[in-house]
């Protein structure tokens, strides 16, 4: 039996590890044409036990769209289908610097999205992995531990996207346009928000704030499942130095809610009315910080002739503005799983690792480009698209469903000529663009 190590127990690492340890019915085999001939001997390395994860703070917002959820279902891993709210629409509105109402739209999702608190998912998946006979080594793993782990396994996959472990993979400057964080982030899981007009069920909505030349940031609200049931999540994407950049002292959940309401009262009074009754779900409900989007070289040599392969955030880290972190993690894990199954008994050498990542990158590069575009002031053609979406339901529908697979945005959203050709084809050409950039 071939031995595989997975270092990191997040969305990507556990999806891969569980796929390599299918249950006795075979229900959790990999999607795609290649099925596992037999389970692998898999060890997951992670710092925290399931109970410690559940007792800790939230980790992300993790809205997963239909295509990524389908990968979990195919692997028998979507355990919260009936419990998690089904997000059926993406709402988009605009607030200008004078705080006057702006244009907006709601695009229905063809396949509902869902968000499951990663504390719930990680803890449940760790327990499921051990129940299937997988081994978990609990404790901190650093770069100095990788040579020993790699020597003891046929393949070592590093799926930890933060801290020293991620740094073993060299930054790829060709695909990493940013050298510092573009947003300061604040997340809080809450209850007590109200539905806006036009959205009568669970959804995700976003309001960018700022003019055509300068953004202040974005405010998100989405429905989710947390430790004790359904909830809402609020997220600030604050441009550094702007009016929403008030999180450097890393406040707790109560203070995040208090500051959020102060910001909403002054900048988004409509959202303030919807959120004024919210309260944190628990003592670990808040997360603040910042990250720099980056693409890293996928293979690292940790000892002479010993290589490890990066997965998920370890090698392609997106800002959460595009909502693609967990979606990309699931897609990457499923791709690696198929590649491992197809490789049979051949060695997992550097050539195989590079080839495996290169095939994944053919899709991931589009996701990275999309998320990076969202971090800057919207180009003129994007402003035309969003303005048209407020008046043409077909445009709103296509935009909303594009988040399920952002590679499709390359066909229209990412290119001015293609965008204008699409708008003309659906009768939305010439849509007025508000002076405030909405």
Where are these regions (language model features)?
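Conserved mid-domain beta->alpha element of the FAD-binding
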Residues: 6, 289-368
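Glycine-rich FAD pyrophosphate-binding loop
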Residues: 7-9, 18-56
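Central beta-strand plus flanking loop segment that forms part of the substrate or channel wall
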Residues: 169-210
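Short beta-strand to alpha-helix junction loop
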Residues: 60-63, 108-124, 159, 165-166, ...
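Beta1/beta-strand and adjacent pyrophosphate-binding region of the FAD-binding site
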Residues: 1-12
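Conserved FAD/dinucleotide-binding core of flavoprotein oxidoreductases
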Residues: 211-286
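N-terminal FAD cofactor-binding segment of flavoenzymes
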Residues: 48-95
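C-terminal helical "tail/cap" subdomain of flavin- and related membrane-associated enzymes
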Residues: 322, 338-438
């Amino acid at each position: 039996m071939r031995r595989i190590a997975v270092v990191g127990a997040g969305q990507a690492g556990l999806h891969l590890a569980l796929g390599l340890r299918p249950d006795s019915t075979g229900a959790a085999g990999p999607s795609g044409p290649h099925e596992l001939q037999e389970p692998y001997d898999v060890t997951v390395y992670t710092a925290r036990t399931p109970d410690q994860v559940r007792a800790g703070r939230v980790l992300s917002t993790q809205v997963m769209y239909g295509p990524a959820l389908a990968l979990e279902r195919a692997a028998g891993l979507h355990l919260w289908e009936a419990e998690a709210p089904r997000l059926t629409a993406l709402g988009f509105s605009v607030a200008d610097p004078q705080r006057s109402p702006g244009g907006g739209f709601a695009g229905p999702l063809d396949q509902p999205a869902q968000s499951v608190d990663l504390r719930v998912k990680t803890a449940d998946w760790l327990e499921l992995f051990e129940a299937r006979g997988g081994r978990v080594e609990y404790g901190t793993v650093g770069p100095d531990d990788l040579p020993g782990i790699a020597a003891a396994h046929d393949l070592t996959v590093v799926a930890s996207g933060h801290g020293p472990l991620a740094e073993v993979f060299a930054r790829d400057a060709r695909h990493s346009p940013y050298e510092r964080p573009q947003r300061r982030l604040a997340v809080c899981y809450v209850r007590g928000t109200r539905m806006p007009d036009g959205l009568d069920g669970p959804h995700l909505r976003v309001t960018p704030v700022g003019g055509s030349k300068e953004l202040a940031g974005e405010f998100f609200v989405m429905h989710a499942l947390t430790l004790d049931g359904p909830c809402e999540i609020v997220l600030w994407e604050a441009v550094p130095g702007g009016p929403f950049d008030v999180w450097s002292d890393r406040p707790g959940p109560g203070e995040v809610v208090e500051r959020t309401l102060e910001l909403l009262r002054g900048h988004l009074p409509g959202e303030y009315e919807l959120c004024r009754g919210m309260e944190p779900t628990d003592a670990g409900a808040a997360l603040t910080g910042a990250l720099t989007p980056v693409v890293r070289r996928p293979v690292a040599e940790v000892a002479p002739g010993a290589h490890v392969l990066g997965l998920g955030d370890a090698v392609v880290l997106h800002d959460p503005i595009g909502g693609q972190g967990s979606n990309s993690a699931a897609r990457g894990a499923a791709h690696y799983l198929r590649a491992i199954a197809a490789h049979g008994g051949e060695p997992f050498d550097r050539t195989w690792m590079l080839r495996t990542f290169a095939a994944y990158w053919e899709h991931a590069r589009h996701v990275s480009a999309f998320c990076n575009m969202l971090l800057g002031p919207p180009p003129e053609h994007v402003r035309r698209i969003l303005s048209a979406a407020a008046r043409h339901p077909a445009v709103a529908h296509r935009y909303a469903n594009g988040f399920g697979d952002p590679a499709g945005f390359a066909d229209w959203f990412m290119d001015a000529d293609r965008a204008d050709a699409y708008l003309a084809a659906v009768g939305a050409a010439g849509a007025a663009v508000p002076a405030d950039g909405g």
